[in-house]
Design a protein with these regions (language model features):
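Short, hinge-like loop/turn segments at secondary-structure boundaries
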Residues: 54-59, 102, 125-128, 280
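Glycine-rich, phosphate-binding/catalytic loops in enzymes
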Residues: 25-27, 99-102, 125-126, 179
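Hydrophobic helix-and-loop "lid/oligomerization" segment in the mid-to-C-terminal part
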Residues: 2-13, 21-53, 60, 71-73, ...
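Short alpha-helices
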Residues: 110-180
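Generic enzyme active-site microenvironment
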Residues: 10, 14, 84, 109-110, ...
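Short glycine/serine/threonine-rich phosphate/pyrophosphate-binding segments
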Residues: 17-23, 90-94
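Active-site cofactor/cluster-binding pocket
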Residues: 61-122
Length: 347
């Protein structure tokens, strides 16, 4: 990397703030080092990330743009170096999986997820790291190039650190994350601006979807210290759901006292997607990996199912007894209050 190279940065399907922020932050740094850089994503990114500097240059595979896949694949084919950010398995990049796998370019993995496939030539991998954005910052720091981090790069990286720690609230938040955030603020990151753009720029449709989910779709299973939410494809269409609109819905369940596991499943038509969030020592990633072709972190994981939404729900309910003791550990006892409201049971 001492000489200018054609660089492609690839991140996972449905990129979140850590995926896009780390990618654009790294891209900004590499451009300052005179590399020709193209960020490629295997799908669109959420609208609430469209403030990130450099987002307009992202080449996103979009089903509504017939040539976007071809252009993305061509960019990968032309690359001399490919950075793979925020994913440890090639199946996380969908239609770009084979182009990246078959590329003769040098591949560099920067990631913090468990059980990497080790497909890259070089790895900057740490499963104890809270975010990929934090690892990108560490990489730039270790190269002695912190002075290259300007406000644009800092804001992108700060967004990744902030969101993957749940606003510095999750158990993965350590002194290291605060130190990284402090250095990024020192380099020009604006915490209040980043927080507002990510958390406080909801559309009316997204707010109505959130209200509907919380009032009609959230189900509590007190005996398992568990909450689940199911959304059908028709329900998603009803609220004109856009990329990113369901982001964060799974987290609401964990705000209920005594809940240790929250699961959100929704019908994407071609498959059922599941998001898992847990508290304490409950391994959400093990459940996702064992039963739903997924994985991730101990307290934040994802999966999928080829069954129908109803069949997926029944499968999930059938396996909960297996985890009853684990879910009860350190769980606070609480009562489920049921009252009649307009002839309906309100939980």
């Amino acid at each position: 990397m001492h000489n200018p190279k054609r660089v492609v940065i690839v991140t996972h399907f449905k990129p979140d703030a850590d995926a896009l922020g780390s990618s654009l932050g790294l891209a900004g740094y590499l451009k300052k080092k005179d590399h020709a850089v193209q960020v490629v994503t295997p799908s669109d990114y959420p609208g609430f990330l469209s403030w990130m500097p450099g987002h307009k240059e992202v080449l996103a595979v979009n089903k509504d743009q017939a040539d976007s896949l071809q252009r993305a694949q061509q960019a990968v084919a032309n690359a001399e170096v490919i950075f793979c950010l925020d994913f440890s398995s090639l199946n996380r990049i969908n239609s770009l999986q084979d182009p990246v796998k078959n590329s003769t370019a040098k591949k560099i993995l920067v990631d913090h997820h468990l059980e990497p496939e080790h497909f890259a030539d070089f790895e900057h991998w740490d499963p104890k790291a809270a975010s990929t954005a934090g690892l990108v910052f560490d990489l730039i720091d270790k190269l002695g190039d912190k002075n290259y981090i300007d406000a644009d790069i800092a804001n992108c990286l700060y967004a990744g650190v902030m969101t993957d720690t749940g606003g510095f609230r999750h158990s993965n938040t350590t002194q290291k994350e605060f130190q990284t955030a402090s250095e990024l603020v020192g380099a020009g990151a604006n915490p209040s601006f980043v927080s507002k753009m990510i958390y406080d720029t909801n559309t009316i449709a997204r707010m109505k979807l959130t209200g509907y989910v919380l009032s009609q779709k959230l189900t509590v299973l007190p005996e398992f210290h568990t909450v689940y939410i199911c959304l059908s494809h028709d329900e998603l269409k009803q609220f004109n759901t856009q990329t990113g609109d369901t982001e964060g819905l799974v987290n609401f369940g964990l705000s209920i006292e005594g809940i240790r596991l929250s699961v959100f499943m929704y019908d994407r038509k071609e498959e059922i997607k599941l998001s898992f969030r847990s508290l304490g020592n409950f391994p959400a990633n093990e459940m996702a990996r064992k039963y739903f072709e997924g994985g991730g972190h101990k307290n934040a994981a994802g999966g999928s199912s080829q069954l129908s939404l109803e069949e997926t729900l029944q499968k999930f309910l059938s396996i909960l007894p297996e985890y009853k003791e684990q879910l009860a550990e350190d769980g606070e006892e609480f009562e489920l209050i049921v009252k009649k409201t307009n002839g309906k049971n309100e939980k």
